[in-house]
UniProtKB/Swiss-Prot annotation:
GO terms for cellular component: chromatin; GBAF complex; SWI/SNF complex. Keywords: Phosphoprotein. The modification Phosphoserine is found at S623, S980. Component of SWI/SNF chromatin remodeling subcomplex GBAF that carries out key enzymatic activities, changing chromatin structure by altering DNA-histone contacts within a nucleosome in an ATP-dependent manner. It comes from Homo sapiens. The gene is BICRAL. GO terms for biological process: chromatin remodeling; negative regulation of cell differentiation; positive regulation of cell population proliferation; positive regulation of DNA-templated transcription; positive regulation of stem cell population maintenance; regulation of transcription by RNA polymerase II. Component of the multiprotein chromatin-remodeling complexes SWI/SNF: SWI/SNF-A (BAF), SWI/SNF-B (PBAF) and related complexes. The canonical complex contains a catalytic subunit (either SMARCA4/BRG1/BAF190A or SMARCA2/BRM/BAF190B) and at least SMARCE1, ACTL6A/BAF53, SMARCC1/BAF155, SMARCC2/BAF170, and SMARCB1/SNF5/BAF47. Other subunits specific to each of the complexes may also be present permitting several possible combinations developmentally and tissue specific. This is BRD4-interacting chromatin-remodeling complex-associated protein-like.
Length: 1079
């Protein structure tokens, strides 16, 4: 933990004075210092934690006061404060707090105490059936506060992150809610999932309610909480059939929200498969019996990677005998109360709840997400909305709508729900009476509420307000049969590129009383088990909400006779193809005989799939669906051919809907409308191979574009399997029409060539212009009187090297002035010789000496060929020259070796030529030794690499002799340069013999020449040892000489010296001139 000046507290632990100075500063510090204002007293000045909760969060103690929940006792000396050191080094169990609000342990205690206080207040309120939430609305944190209200033991085991408090803003909720304010009390929170993220939430649309909604799970990894505090100052009235809910729910409505990626809002409340419906119709006036709203748990399942955050608000204790669960479904939300919220709808509770138009649902707003989900509202203006679960249940034909309760919400759109006339589902004031056939369709005015925009990944926008996957099938009530049909609980689709973990979309069918049917859910969804068939005129014949998972999708269906609910992660499809949401379709039914049944063949098993799935690009229902159109039949979009499922639904009465889903054959069902009195629902199934016919809403151009895109996709990823039939071959080959075209002609090629040439020419011109500009800049910089900074640096470096080389030359001139002058003159003569050889003056004289040099050169070329070097003499120079440079560097200065190094620097072209000339001139003086000079290093290199040809002592003596011979030859170079008039001729002859690429020689011949040269070197090495300078140089050069070490020295030491000498090229000339002038 570092403070502003990067001084670490751990460094100050052992020194109380330094720590006091670090904490409080010098005595003359200003009175407005952060730590001085923090209220440190003299008694506890030695304690870091004294009044740490009052300290400014931006002070240097913020890490200590935030990360440490409790400090040691006052007056604890810092020199022995080991607890501080341990707490400093350990990771804090509490979450990292922001600087907006420092940690306050009192606040945390109050938050924990508020749970009990809230429970007591709510019980008192429920008993008195009136009251205000003012008494516990004060127990809220600042919306942006991130102080932890969670015990460390609850959260630290998961991901180290803890829940953040939920900000609350008080919003008036209308005239009936004027006297009530809503506060979300921070209940006792505990983790259920793994690695729960910490996010802020705020309740933007406030509601009143007499119960709690426990929200388990997360919307896009955000924890959230809902409370219903006051219901219009009254209670929810239970008006049931005298049957109680089964007791396996344990007293709470469990609204199961499966949100694969936190976007879909399809809630499954699952209590019991065979429960009786409990309708709770209330307008704001008629209340009959006081019914305590029990703990409503809204559980939202999450994506495989997301986390679950349950927020448990303890409700009033529930009597085990009288357990009623309530399905809080789509509740009417006024526009000014909704702020990008989510109205929670449950889809599969065994008991339908009837909620009045004025009840609002608390909207959980996601502050920290950029993609708030749009709130969906269901409201009825004149009557009550009966939201039935898809389970098979008896129902008395009330004048009520059956509204599907699944809402698919786009995560990218932020639209406010319109007012009542523009709400998503709006019913006419005239309700359906018992003898009426759906004269008012639920999906009225679907376009007026600008709900959702289509996202690209969402392949099946159902309604014109794309992604308003409020796939509503208006369930109509039937007078004659008295068995109402419930709505299609279409599954919400994920939008925004999320991977659809499909929700259950139990599509419920209108059935006659005596007939049984199975509604096939979307494949890949996991839902609750359902009643398969229920007989009796007052029951739903069969409503199967168990949307079974297709086996190939790897999903599973959780089924069980006792309504098991999803609490864990939902299942994911392996094949990751976003299955579109089910299409909104209107099911026309006659009042007296509604006998359209879709019976699933027993062979399909768990592969049930209702035809209401759609994967069309767009099903634009731009015009609001008016009420009389409900009898037109169901408008069905194309079915995705994702699953091979055959649904030969057969009707016991008059209709057959056969949907044959091929693996790649989407279909479109067209429903022929029928009058209310006729039971005709006819579905024509058009199966057209890969090409699916367009829906009614598709224009011709859109369909052509769609077909082209499909053909292009098939062309890019062709099916390489065998043709099954002629039609299959035609279908698969016709898609290649998008690739039509002709081969490029000569004209096309010429045009491309011209374009390329134009571009290349322009590029070259621009490059040349840039180079010219750079040269001009360099020239201008050179002509400046005041040089630029770059030139100044270059000059400094140059001058530094010049001074170093000049001092070295001065030392050399002082030690051996004659040798220095001789080297200087030698370098000039060598330069002249190099130029003469370049002009091609050659002669045949000295062919004997050149031939004596040639076999070693060939052997060297042979050896160099292995390393990729083709110029043997040139490569030999890099070993010969550094030998002499090393000798001079160790103090045994031979003027000839320095002359050699300078010759290399003077002329790069004459590098090979100079060495060969120097050796040749030495050979004029000592013919035998000169012929052995060049092969010397090569001979020792060969023998050292082939240690089996001789003993180590013999090799060492040979190598020593070779080096002696080289130094000797160099000592004679000066005189040979002056005395030999034919040096140039000899040099050119040597270049003629060895500089040209040598043909391949036989290995035996090269080995013989190598051994001959070694023997000659041994003989010749004994002669020059009488020279004292040479012998001294040998002793200094090779004190402990071994064959391998000598080669390493040649390779490692000599080449760096040689490169160092090349850098000093220009400075040596100047130094030589200066030395001559000094002499």
């Amino acid at each position: 933990m570092d403070d502003d000046d990067d001084s670490c507290l751990l460094d100050l632990i052992g020194d109380p004075q330094a720590l006091n100075y670090f904490l409080h500063g010098p005595s003359n510090k200003s009175s407005n210092d952060d730590l001085t204002n923090a209220g440190y007293s003299a008694a506890n000045s030695n304690s870091i934690f004294a009044n740490s909760s009052n300290a400014d969060p931006k002070s240097s103690l913020k890490g200590v006061s935030n990360q440490l929940g409790e400090g040691p006792s006052d007056g604890l000396p810092l020199s022995s404060s080991l607890q501080f050191l341990e707490d400093e080094l350990e990771s804090s169990p509490l979450p990292d707090l922001t600087e907006d609000q420092p940690f306050d342990i009192l606040q945390k205690s109050l938050q924990e105490a508020n749970i009990t206080e809230q429970t007591l207040a709510e019980e008192a309120y429920l008993d008195a059936s009136i009251g205000s939430s003012q008494q516990f609305a004060q127990a809220q944190l600042h919306p942006s506060s991130s102080a932890s209200f969670t015990q460390a033991s609850n959260v630290s085991n998961y991901s180290g992150q803890t829940l953040q408090p939920i900000g609350v803003t008080h919003v008036p909720v209308g005239a009936s809610f004027a006297s009530n304010t809503v506060g979300v009390q921070h209940g006792f929170m505990q983790h259920v999932g793994i690695s729960v993220p910490s996010q802020h939430l705020s309740n933007s649309s406030q509601i009143s309610g007499s119960g709690q909604i426990q929200l388990i799970g997360s919307f896009g990894n955000h924890p959230s909480m809902m409370t219903i505090n006051n219901l219009d100052g009254s209670q929810i009235i239970l008006k049931g059939s005298g049957q109680q809910a089964p007791s396996n729910v344990s007293g709470g409505l469990l609204v199961h929200r499966q949100t694969p990626n936190g976007n879909s809002l399809f809630g499954n409340s699952s209590s019991s498969p065979v429960a009786q419906p409990v309708t709770v119709p209330f307008n704001s006036t008629n209340f009959q019996t006081s019914l305590p709203v029990h703990n409503i748990i809204i559980q939202r399942g999450l994506a495989p990677n997301s986390n679950k955050v349950p927020i448990n608000i303890q409700p009033k204790p529930i009597q085990m005998g009288q357990q009623n669960t309530y399905n809080v479904n789509n509740l009417g939300i006024q526009q000014h109360h909704v702020q990008q919220g989510i109205s929670f709808a449950s889809a599969s509770s065994p008991q339908g709840s009837v909620v009045g138009p004025h009840m609002s649902v608390n909207i959980v707003n996601q502050q920290n997400t950029r993609k708030p989900v749009t709130s969906q509202a269901v409201s009825s203006t004149g009557g009550s909305i009966v939201i039935h679960s898809p389970m098979g249940q008896p129902h008395a034909p009330q004048s009520q709508f059956l509204i599907p309760t699944s809402l698919s919400v786009s995560s990218n759109s932020v639209h406010h729900v319109q007012t009542i006339n523009g709400q998503l589902l709006q019913t006419q004031p005239s309700q359906l009476i018992s003898g009426q056939v759906a004269s008012e369709h639920v999906m009225l005015n679907r376009n007026s509420s600008n709900m959702l925009r289509t996202n690209q990944p969402y392949t099946g926008p159902m309604l014109n307000n794309q992604n308003t996957a409020v796939h509503l099938v208006s369930g109509q009530t039937f007078a004659a049969s008295g068995s109402p049909v419930i709505a299609n609980h279409a599954s919400p689709q994920l939008v925004g590129g999320q991977m659809p973990l499909q929700q259950a979309s139990p599509t419920v069918l209108h059935l006659s009383p005596g007939q049984s049917s199975v509604s096939q859910g979307r494949p890949g969804f996991a839902t609750m088990p359902s009643v398969t068939s229920m007989s009796g005129p007052s029951r739903f014949p069969a409503v199967s909400s168990a949307s079974t998972a297709h086996p190939s999708l790897g999903s599973a269906v959780q089924s069980g006779s006792s309504g098991s609910n999803f609490t864990g992660d939902q299942l994911t499809q392996p094949n990751r193809t976003p299955v579109p949401v089910s299409v909104s379709h209107r099911l026309p039914v006659s009042s007296s005989k509604s006998t359209s049944t879709f019976s699933n063949t027993p062979g399909t098993g768990t592969q049930q799939q209702f035809f209401c799935q759609a994967q069309k690009k767009c099903l634009n229902q731009t015009s609001p669906i008016s009420a009389p159109k409900t009898t037109d039949g169901l408008r069905q979009a194309q079915i995705p051919g994702l699953l091979s499922t055959t649904l030969p639904g057969q009707d016991s009465g008059s209709k057959v809907i056969s949907a044959s889903l091929g693996t790649a054959q989407p279909q479109q069902e067209k429903v022929v409308g029928s009058s209310p009195g006729h039971p005709a629902v006819q579905v024509e199934s058009h199966s057209g191979g890969q090409k699916r016919p367009a829906a009614k809403q598709l224009t011709k151009g859109a369909f052509i574009l769609q077909q082209l895109q499909r053909d292009q996709a098939h062309t890019v990823t062709p099916d390489k399997s065998h043709f099954r039939s002629l039609s299959d071959a035609v279908q698969r080959l016709l898609s290649y029409h998008v690739c039509q075209g002709s081969m490029p002609t000569e004209e096309d090629l010429r045009k491309v060539d011209n374009e390329f040439e134009t571009v290349a020419t322009q590029l070259l011109k621009r490059t040349q212009a840039m180079l010219n500009k750079y040269r001009c800049l360099l020239l201008e910089d050179a002509m400046r009187i005041n040089p630029s900074a770059e030139m100044v640096m270059i000059d400094r470096m140059f001058n530094q090297e010049e001074r170093a080389s000049l001092s070295r030359d001065k030392r050399l001139a002082l030690v051996d002035p004659e040798g220095f002058q001789a080297d200087f003159c030698c370098s000039f003569k060598l330069d002249k010789a190099a130029h003469e050889t370049q002009f091609g003056r050659s002669d045949q004289h000295g062919s004997k000496a050149s031939s004596s040099l040639q076999p070693p050169a060939k052997a060297q070329g042979r050896d160099r060929a292995k390393t990729g070097v083709t110029e043997p003499m040139n490569h030999d120079q890099f070993h010969l020259v550094p030998n002499h440079i090393v000798v001079s560097a160790e103090g045994n200065i031979s003027k000839k070796t320095e002359c050699l190094g300078r010759a290399l620097k003077f002329d790069k072209v004459g590098l090979v030529q100079y060495q060969s000339t120097s050796e040749e001139k030495a050979s004029r003086r000592e013919p035998l030794k000169a012929s052995q000079c060049s092969p010397g290093p090569e001979g020792h290199r060969k023998t050292s690499s082939r240690s089996d040809h001789g003993t180590e002592s013999k090799l060492s003596s040979i190598l020593a002799d070779s080096h002696l011979e080289m130094t000797c030859n160099n000592s004679f170079q000066d005189k040979s340069l002056r005395n030999s008039p034919k040096n140039e001729v000899l040099h050119t002859d040597i270049m003629k013999g060895s500089g040209e690429p040598q043909p391949d020689l036989q290995l035996t011949k090269s080995l013989e020449t190598t051994f001959k040269n070694i023997l000659e070197l041994k003989k010749a090495g004994r002669q020059p040892q009488s020279d004292p300078t040479v012998s001294g140089s040998v002793e200094l050069d090779f004190p402990n000489f071994s064959p391998m070490a000598s080669q390493e020295n040649c390779l490692e030491k000599f080449i760096p010296d040689h490169s160092e000498g090349v850098v000093e090229t220009d400075s040596i000339l100047e130094a030589a001139v200066n030395s001559i002038l000094e002499c």
